[in-house]
């Protein structure tokens, strides 16, 4: 019998492992603006490289497909070759023996359909579409398109006030985004090619820590235009629109239903994540522009909306998604069952709950659920659990929020779907009954749960918080004539509100009524992030300005520092730390500890200044962009 031995890892295997790690980092840092067909080609060539060669369709078909796609990327293919490529891809997909062949071919077919306009441009115009061109990844992926390299360079120079002014050129909530932004700007940071993406949010937080938003001078307001703009909703989107419209010289009135400004970043985010005094700094900075009049505790119904549309030159509706969705299960009317959105809203006005000695169950897996469970811990709950019908990896909450909740003692009960709420004799909730789930087929990009053949679970609970989504209060605005669908107002790309002809006729309004109404933020997109709401407010202000016959240009008055040589040595990423869990879970004080000056300077030094190096380069049929 032949003896067995443990084969040592070869040097080639180690080198290949290192190469694959580099390849993964390159994919992670794929810049925006690349030709999608070129990306398809990269994927297809990788599939051809991986083929084992045992089946002809995969072994011979994939290299042929790669050659045909290369012709198309180089703008040398005609329509007939595209059709031959499609037919060959269908054959490879249908006859390959393994996933390498049929998945590679299927991905190509999906790409040809998804990027049909790009294919047509390569064939008929012999160039990529105008939307293709290397851009600065962080600035492109920021919904508000903040000039990230510029303010990082200003922080590196120690000009913290200049950095805040640079941020405010596109985003008047620098402090909010320094503390609670989901930082999509970091997704494709080119620094990933070397080590890890920059901690952009942490640098912004550091800048706002050293130059408070209400102490940094605001830009000078442009000459008055005599035009009036009404903003319905004093949240991040509404206040952003008000800020930019006022800077352009328009007079703005903000109508807010609640006692205080801030919207869902005041009434939906707990103080331990975003201290209220820091939010007030941003708001004071916005109002310092002048020309903005605030009306709090001023709800807007259909009649008042009609009056605003008649009295003002433009109206921007940004009411947010301020109500919680319910669950269609028995027992939701029990005492002790609360909407997570309502609970956080009361906390926003300083009405903190007392859960001392109670068992709290939170239903949901998003950021609101994490905010609720961590709030319950601070409110003195004896036990806190999050009940979710999928896995932890499927939760939509930020991974850092999940990790922090677990560190503070929250139990994650996964693959359990709420079935009913059990009441005691006094009508109070005493337990949550759940049906076990197992992970099933992938639907809409993630695995869907299906019922598992296991007994029902009983989770004791004195308080149950429902955090399964948010809705808008659309009825008054629909009565006015604004069109809504699936709980969201409808608008075009310029955020002009779409009007419902039948609703307008029902109230005897002219068909042109509402032509000056814009809508944006969560009430138009569905619940999203603060930075997306801010971006909508910026877009609305710009388009309102155009509608009123102007084309104002705003300047923050700060020069972008020149790019400095960078040795590009690999460094670890500086993370923003939190206070120890055993300490922070006992109060509502800020949990994050901002970077030190040394940490911030090191992190700023990692910036590759993509605004100066590597932007605009092109090849093949790609158009040169400056």
Residue ranges and their predicted role:
Residues 1-129:
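Redox cofactor-anchoring modules in respiratory/redox and cofactor-processing assemblies
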Residues 45-67, 90-107, 130-150, 172-193, ...:
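Local cysteine-cluster metal-coordination motifs and their immediate loop/turn environment
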Residues 206-223, 284-297, 301-302, 324-379, ...:
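Glycine-rich dinucleotide-binding loop and its adjacent helix/turn
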Residues 223, 228-232, 280-329, 420-432, ...:
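Feature captures the FAD/FMN-dependent oxidoreductase FAD-binding
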Residues 227-253, 369-377:
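N-terminal Rossmann-like FAD-binding beta1-loop-alpha1 element of flavoenzymes
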Residues 251-254, 258-285, 289-296, 347, ...:
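Rossmann-like dinucleotide-binding cores of NAD(P)H-dependent redox enzymes
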Residues 335-358, 442-527, 560-563:
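FAD-site-proximal beta/loop scaffold in flavoenzymes
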Residues 372, 523-551:
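A conserved FAD-binding loop/helix module that cradles the flavin
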